[in-house]
Amino acid sequence: MRLNTLSPAEGAKHAPKRVGRGIGSGLGKTAGRGHKGQNSRSGGGVRRGFEGGQMPLYRRLPKFGFTSRKAMITAEVRLSELALVEGDVIDLNTLKAANVVGTQIEFAKVMLSGEITRAVTLRGLRVTKGARAAIEAAGGKIEE
């Protein structure tokens, strides 16, 4: 077997539809596009969201909201992900080193999701009430 002898299984590939190749093909002359009109022309058709000149939905509805720039540099960390970090003291840099959060992250908050079994010290991270209770129950502590 060589690369130049490989071919798809019989019946696995369908031949493309050949249009505009005579009356007998069933798709000659207008090639299945009908007569006249915008969609029959080369490059015809209307853009996405166009409603024939009527004020389109995306312009009829009001604008709202924005994208918080702080949300882009903030991460949520689960309790179970703290197990991936080596060492007893966990801060933002150790989370980045363990690939728990991305390098562009500047703020992190620890959430109560999963379990923590070892005692760790969190430094400079925000913590939810539930996560704080779980960390302290495991013998850890939180430093601001």
From Swiss-Prot:
It comes from the Bacteria. One of its GO terms (biological process) is translation. GO terms for cellular component: cytosolic large ribosomal subunit. Keywords: Ribonucleoprotein, Ribosomal protein, RNA-binding, rRNA-binding. GO terms for molecular function: rRNA binding; structural constituent of ribosome. InterPro entries: Ribosomal_uL15 (IPR030878), Ribosomal_uL15/eL18 (IPR021131), Ribosomal_uL15/eL18_sf (IPR036227), Ribosomal_uL15_bac-type (IPR005749), Ribosomal_uL15_CS (IPR001196). Residues 21-31 have a biased composition (Gly residues). Residues 1-52 are annotated as: Disordered. Belongs to the universal ribosomal protein uL15 family. Part of the 50S ribosomal subunit. HAMAP family: Ribosomal_uL15. Binds to the 23S rRNA. NCBIfam families: rplO_bact (TIGR01071). PANTHER family: 50S RIBOSOMAL PROTEIN L15, LARGE RIBOSOMAL SUBUNIT PROTEIN UL15M. This is Large ribosomal subunit protein uL15. The gene is rplO.
